[in-house]
Amino acid sequence: MGDGMKALITGASSGIGRDMARYLSNQGYDLILVARRKTRLQELKKELKTNIEIINIDISSTFNCMDLYKTVKDEDIDVLINCAGFGIYGNFNDTSLDKELDLIDTNIKAVHTLTKLFLKDFVKKDEGYILNVSSSAGFMSGPLMSSYYASKGYVLKLTEAISYELKKECSNVY
């Protein structure tokens, strides 16, 4: 299925990102795995069957997102999967503002930046796939994880809006 195709996965060192890497490698995709935890990426690379490139970078920095894009833009990527993210637990009034701003940088700004950069390339060649991993939290709100709920709502609404725009243009980017 994915023979000859290449996917870039952020947050690939654990959770959904790691599982997506395993699944896509089994489907024949070559992968670029991106995360902060290099050791975990190296361990994952050993178990995968296809060509794997590891990029150890913290995408909470917009500069690092731009640098990541510049590093891989000529590699003919077919699929972008934005999985990097984290949550903060506690009453909004009690949680750390610094941690919340880090959450916004990772869960929102990195997704927004990478989607914008790769989408331009995908639209230009009229093919490509972007999967922005949100959460059921994106559909609701609740106590003790207000920043996480809000960040996943942003990802959901951004992705839906882009999808509508692409559909209206009869684009082959999904």
Enumerate the predicted regions with their spans:
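Conserved glycine-rich cofactor-binding loop
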Residues: 13-14
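Active-site helix of classical SDR
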Residues: 115, 151
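Conserved NAD(P)H cofactor-binding loop of Rossmann-fold oxidoreductase domains
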Residues: 83-88
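Conserved glycine-rich Rossmann-like NAD(P)H-binding loop of the short-chain dehydrogenase/reductase
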Residues: 27-43
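Residue(s) in the substrate-gating loop at a strand-loop-helix junction
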Residues: 135
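Rossmann-fold cofactor-recognition segment
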Residues: 48-63
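Substrate-binding pocket helix/loop in short-chain dehydrogenase/reductase
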Residues: 91-92, 99-104
